[in-house]
């Protein structure tokens, strides 16, 4: 296909138009007074959501250069979501603000490389400052506050806090569709391990890039599966049995993955190969625990011998398996309870004998999974639309809460970023660069610092604006307040944010800033946009 090229200011202007279109759609959702976006979907019902990454993924612009800009800024949202599980709207707002300010300066003749360096260095300083402000959370009340803020619901906050109390702060909590309008919490047997599908062609949910298997049979292999011949009898048996088949192994030969993927796409068999991405003792432990919890063995298949004595009846069972990009969760494993109990007793015995911290932590983790199980939040709703919207909010809140437990919290409502921005006004900043570059370069690097400093106001400004209040006056007043004081969008008053339960997970805010700065830095150093030229159809009549 032919390509078209567009250069310099023209390229940046059109990229920026796409960036602003997607960011303006996303940022109306931020804060407790944020609004929803309704998305048309080609092969599904419309979706009402306030989830930034979901909105960003769905938008496709008609102008090819604008669409490139839209897709690039959505990277900030997607990568933030992949790491922190939330903060996608904050990342989008920051990326938009930095990119607009950066391109404005570049178009006036500044050196993009110096501006980029300033943005990157300033962002690192802010991240360190956020870590200083961070406060660890320990109590159920604090966990409930984080979940309630993220989801916009005190009821959801309570539910997530209860779930963490049941399975532990590092336990497995997942969501599922309820068959009623009520949202409830239950615990069941289950484990989670690092492992994902061996081929993207095995994915059943393209939107989330995950696979869900209901009532699957489970084959666990302790060695790499090298040929399809090894597992052919089991594949044939599974077709007759009618249940989906989950195959978990340390690795698979390319031939095996291709054959399984092709047969899944053809509808011959519902099979998913999962590569266990744990290593060493952790891999051995994950496979052993999976086998015991699902009622099977971790088979040691020697090359060319296959699984001669293994039939479908020897395989494990579970109520449900969720396979995501980085982890696999097995829910409702149907292993023998007495065997699981003996296995836990054996692990407790090992725990008493070990003096190595790594081994001790691993054994504790295994015991927790096998004895505490998995918490399942069953999401209800009056309609399918309402159920999906609520499920997205709960999943975001779960991710936020886990991030808060991991790295602590800062003042919410964009106040943490506002407070941290003070570090960029330090008069000694110039000294960082005096021995390595010219005065002109230093000026431009500090312009990058200024871009970041001004951009850090954007999340708070948008939250205030979404609440129906003029943000200019409020932001001016907040700059003169003590650290941690911000604007409560619910009461429209200035309050101590953390004391009033208005918080953000430190990890989420740090990740949003890091990814936004990365995207903005890449965009402001872009000078050429290349896109496909659509071929025109010749509709003229020929004799």
Curated annotation (Swiss-Prot):
> One GO cellular component from the entry?
GroEL-GroES complex
Q: Which InterPro entries match?
A: Chaperonin_Cpn60_CS, Cpn60/GroEL, Cpn60/GroEL/TCP-1, GroEL-like_apical_dom_sf, GROEL-like_equatorial_sf, TCP-1-like_intermed_sf
Q: Residues that bind ATP, according to the entry?
A: 29-32, 86-90, 413, 504
GO MF terms on file?
ATP binding; ATP-dependent protein folding chaperone; isomerase activity; unfolded protein binding
Q: What class of enzyme is it?
A: isomerase
Q: Which domain of life is it from?
A: Bacteria
What keywords were assigned to this record? ATP-binding, Chaperone, Cytoplasm, Isomerase, Nucleotide-binding
| Keyword Translocase belongs to the record | no
Q: Which reactions appear under catalytic activity for this entry?
A: ATP + H2O + a folded polypeptide = ADP + phosphate + an unfolded polypeptide
**One Pfam family of this protein, by short name?**
Cpn60_TCP1
Gene knockout outcome? Probably essential, it was not disrupted in a global transposon mutagenesis study.
Quaternary structure annotation from Swiss-Prot or TrEMBL: Forms a cylinder of 14 subunits composed of two heptameric rings stacked back-to-back. Interacts with the co-chaperonin GroES.
Query: Can you name this protein?
Result: Chaperonin GroEL
Per the UniProt entry, what species is this protein from, by scientific name? Answer: Mycoplasma genitalium (strain ATCC 33530 / DSM 19775 / NCTC 10195 / G37)
């Amino acid at each position: 296909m032919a390509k078209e090229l567009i250069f310099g200011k023209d390229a940046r202007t059109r990229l920026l138009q796409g960036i602003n279109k997607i960011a303006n759609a996303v940022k109306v959702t931020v804060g407790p007074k944020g609004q929803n976006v309704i998305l048309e979907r080609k092969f599904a019902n419309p979706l009402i959501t306030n989830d930034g990454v979901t909105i960003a993924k769905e938008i496709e612009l008609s102008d090819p250069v604008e669409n490139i800009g839209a897709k690039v800024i959505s990277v900030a949202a997607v990568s933030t979501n992949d790491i922190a599980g939330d903060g996608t709207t904050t990342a989008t707002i920051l990326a938009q603000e930095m990119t607009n300010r950066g391109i404005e300066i570049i178009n006036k003749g500044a050196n993009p490389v110096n501006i980029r360096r300033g943005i990157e260095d300033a962002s690192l300083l802010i991240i360190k400052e956020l870590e200083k402000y961070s406060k660890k959370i320990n109590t159920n009340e604090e966990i409930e506050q984080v979940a309630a803020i993220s989801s916009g619901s005190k009821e959801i906050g309570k539910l997530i806090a209860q779930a963490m109390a049941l399975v532990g702060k590092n336990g497995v909590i997942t969501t599922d569709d309820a068959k009623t309008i009520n949202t409830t919490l239950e615990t069941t047997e289950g484990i989670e391990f690092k492992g994902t599908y061996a081929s993207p062609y095995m994915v059943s949910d393209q939107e989330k890039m995950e696979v869900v298997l209901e009532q699957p049979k489970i084959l666990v292999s302790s060695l790499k599966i090298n040929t399809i011949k090894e597992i052919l009898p089991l594949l044939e048996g599974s077709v007759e049995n009618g249940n989906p088949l989950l195959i978990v192994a340390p690795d698979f030969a390319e031939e095996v993955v291709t054959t399984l993927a092709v047969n899944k796409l053809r509808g011959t068999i519902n099979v998913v190969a999962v590569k266990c991405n744990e290593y060493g003792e952790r891999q051995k432990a994950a496979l052993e625990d999976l086998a015991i919890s699902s009622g099977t063995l971790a088979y040691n298949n020697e090359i060319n011998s296959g699984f001669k004595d293994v039939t479908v009846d020897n395989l494990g069972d579970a109520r449900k398996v969720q396979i995501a990009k980085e982890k696999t969760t097995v829910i409702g494993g149907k292993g023998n309870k007495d065997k699981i109990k003996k296995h836990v007793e054996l692990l407790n015995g090992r725990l008493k004998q070990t003096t190595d911290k790594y081994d001790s932590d691993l054994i504790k983790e295994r015991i927790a999974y096998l004895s505490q199980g998995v918490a399942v939040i069953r999401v209800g709703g009056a309609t399918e639309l309402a159920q999906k919207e609520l499920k997205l909010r709960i999943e975001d809140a779960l991710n936020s809460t886990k991030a808060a437990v991991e790295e602590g919290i800062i003042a919410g409502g964009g106040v943490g970023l506002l407070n941290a921005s003070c570090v960029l006004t330090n008069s000694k900043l110039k000294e960082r660069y005096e021995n390595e570059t010219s005065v002109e370069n230093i000026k431009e690097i500090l312009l990058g610092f200024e871009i970041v400093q001004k951009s850090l106001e954007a999340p708070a400004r948008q939250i205030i604006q979404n609440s129906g209040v003029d943000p200019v006056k409020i932001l001016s007043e907040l700059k003169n307040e003590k650290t941690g004081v911000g604007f409560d969008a619910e009461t429209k008053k200035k309050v101590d944010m953390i004391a009033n339960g208005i918080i953000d997970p430190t990890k989420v805010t740090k990740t949003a800033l890091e990814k936004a700065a990365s995207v903005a830095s890449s965009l402001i150093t872009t000078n050429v946009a290349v896109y496909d030229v659509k071929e025109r159809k010749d509709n003229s009549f020929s004799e």
